[in-house]
């Protein structure tokens, strides 16, 4: 796909090798309309697509998009998963094709020490996860601020990507819905790289 070819070019041009990782939900319909929606009738296991937005204390029916962006807010990798998937499951689905020594900042939902150690040992990628208060691995204050700075960048990007999406994505099949999400991300990537 052209998105991935452009992404590899952007990764090569990103000399800082600093990235941010986060996910955002894309609802197919409101919860109240699940039984009447034509698209949801074609989804076999509906519970896989029922997710929760913890920050808003709200459930949704749709997909969750995992996105990795550069410091300049260019998306370079993404994965579209059912809404019930956790952030760690999304991390497992990403290709993580980055240069050695790359740093990927993520929020506390990606806390998994085995993943951090594996990526550092095998791929030489440093996964910078924001630590919870009860974490076994404690960060220095400077590292905590650095992770927060990198993490806030992706929140801005996700807001900009969601502005690209229409209020409702019209699709008749699940594959068409996912294709439209991928095309919106590609359009955002082109807009961010060449127009803005």
What are the language-model segments listed below?
Residues 1-196:
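Short alpha-helical elements
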